[in-house]
């Protein structure tokens, strides 16, 4: 796996958060795609698509932790004929207890892939793994993917230059945010 850039992940998740907060009615918080919390240990972003899939990204000063859950994955213990705790435990094998403790038992149970990055990427994988790594696409490795997702998911037309600025910087002014969404 290639180098994971803390600043880029934060900026791209912040960009998605800005769009999601702007377009989601505060009275309908349950419809949010992404939620950001600031914790003692760092920043946490939870992306939940409302269909049983989630991506939980924790950014500490020393680590990046990325936990994914794809409810259709063969690694989901909720869909297994027989629960296999060893599969879940193996995802976290080698992770320092101080970081492991950031997840509740229920959160750990909802894991179909887990990556941590401390300068080197660590991931326990399985043969024929289909653990939902597609969820990593929420980290948007290109502006084109971000643009396509935003316009398709939210069904909006945007000022491409302002969206690019949001993608690169992770924020827009209030005025820029109002100008971002174009009337069809």
Tell me the role of every PLM-derived stretch.
Residues 69-76:
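Short, solvent-exposed aromatic-acidic interface loops
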Residues 1-52, 61, 76-184:
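N-terminal domain-onset segments
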């Amino acid at each position: 796996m290639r180098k994971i850039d803390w600043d880029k992940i934060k900026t791209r998740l912040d960009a998605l958060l800005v769009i999601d907060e702007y377009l989601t009615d505060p009275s309908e918080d349950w419809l949010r795609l992404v939620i950001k919390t600031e914790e003692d240990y760092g920043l946490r972003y939870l992306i939940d698509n409302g269909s049983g899939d989630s991506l939980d990204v924790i950014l500490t000063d020393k680590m990046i932790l990325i936990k994914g859950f794809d409810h259709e994955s063969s690694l989901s213990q909720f869909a297994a004929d027989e629960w296999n705790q060893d599969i879940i435990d193996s995802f976290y094998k080698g992770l320092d207890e101080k970081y492991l403790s950031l997840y509740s038992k229920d959160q750990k149970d909802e894991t179909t892939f887990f990556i941590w990055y401390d300068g080197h990427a660590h991931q326990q994988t399985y043969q024929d793994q289909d653990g939902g790594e597609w969820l990593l696409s929420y980290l948007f490795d290109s502006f084109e993917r971000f643009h396509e997702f935003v316009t398709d998911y939210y069904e909006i037309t945007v000022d491409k230059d302002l969206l690019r600025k949001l993608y690169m910087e992770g924020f827009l002014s209030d005025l820029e945010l109002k100008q971002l969404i174009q009337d069809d």
